C-alpha cells in the first residue's frame, strides 16, 4: 500500500509505539472478515494483529481524509469514553467535525432536526459501539472508516484499520498516528522532523484519577507551605544600645582588696584533728554540732616516749 517508498515505510519508532500501547493485541474472538488481518494466536487465546497491515490501512485512511477538500466535511464519532478525548484532539488538529458522546439518531437522515449533518466521510472508533451512525451512513451513501478489533463486525465499513480499539492507550495512539499522517500528506508538517505533539495528549484519563492527582498536589503544596512557615520564620529583632567604646560605656565598680596572712605548714598540721586508725564512724558528721574549738592551740603532749626508765639495753 505504501508503494515501496521509503518515505511511507513504517519506522522503528512507530513499531515501538505500537508495541508499547498494545495495538497489536486483539481479542479472544475472531470475526471471519478479520481473519486475514491476524498474524497468529497466542497460547492464552489472544489474537496478534499484523502491524504491517495496520500501517497500510492507516495510510489508506489518511489518503481518503486528505482527498476531502473541506476538512469540516469529515465527521469523527466516538461513543465510548476511551476515544472521546482522542476524537476531540483529532478534530482540533485536522479541522474535522466531531460527535463525542451519544449519537442522536437521525443526524444523517432526518432533515427536520436541527442537528442534521451531511458529511462526506465518517470515522468511528468502534463499529460495534457506533453501529447507529454506520447504519445511517449506509442509507445516504457516506464512506466510512473504522478502527476494528479482531471481533468487530465489518458491515457498512469501507476502510477497516485493524488494531486494538479497547485499550485507551491504543485508541489514543491510533488517532494520533492518523492525525500525523493527515498533516504530513497535507504538507502541514514535515516527515523529516518529529511532530511536536505528544501521543499522551490523545490518551483517555479517568476523571476520578485526575481529581485524586489534583487533591494530592494540593495537599503536598499545603504541607510544603506549613513546613516553610514553621522553619523559615524571620528571627526576632532585639534593639541593642550602640556603644562606641566598651571601656567608656561600662562602669567598673571599685572593690576593696583584703589582706590575708599566709598560712604555714606547721599551723595547718596543728589545726588538723587527730585520726585514730582502726576506728569506724557510723554517725553523720554533718548532723552533729561541733564541740571542739579547732582554732585553739593544741595541748601539750608528753615528751617522755620511753616510759619510766631510760635504760634501753
From Swiss-Prot:
Record-marked site positions (Cleavage): 115-116, 133-134
Q: Which CDD domains match?
A: RPS2
- GO terms for cellular component: cytosolic small ribosomal subunit; nucleus; plasma membrane
- Compartments in which it is found: Cell membrane; Cytoplasm; Nucleus
Principal place where this protein is found?
membrane
What PTM annotation applies here? Acylated. Acylation may be a prerequisite for conversion of the monomeric 37 kDa laminin receptor precursor (37LRP) to the mature dimeric 67 kDa laminin receptor (67LR), and may provide a mechanism for membrane association.
Q: InterPro entries from the entry?
A: Ribosomal_uS2, Ribosomal_uS2_C, Ribosomal_uS2_CS, Ribosomal_uS2_euk, Ribosomal_uS2_euk/arc, Ribosomal_uS2_flav_dom_sf, Ribosomal_uS2_vert
Q: Which UniProt keywords apply?
A: Acetylation, Cell membrane, Cytoplasm, Membrane, Nucleus, Receptor, Repeat, Ribonucleoprotein, Ribosomal protein
Locate the compositionally biased regions of type Low complexity: 262-274
Cited function: Required for the assembly and/or stability of the 40S ribosomal subunit. Required for the processing of the 20S rRNA-precursor to mature 18S rRNA in a late step of the maturation of 40S ribosomal subunits. Also functions as a cell surface receptor for laminin. Plays a role in cell adhesion to the basement membrane and in the consequent activation of signaling transduction pathways. May play a role in cell fate determination and tissue morphogenesis.
Q: Which HAMAP family match?
A: Ribosomal_S2_euk (MF_03015), Ribosomal_S2_laminin_receptor (MF_03016)
The family note in this entry says:
Belongs to the universal ribosomal protein uS2 family.
- Recorded protein name is Small ribosomal subunit protein uS2
Species whose genome carries this gene: Solea senegalensis
Q: What is the lineage of its organism?
A: Eukaryota, Metazoa, Chordata, Craniata, Vertebrata
**Gene of this entry:** rpsa
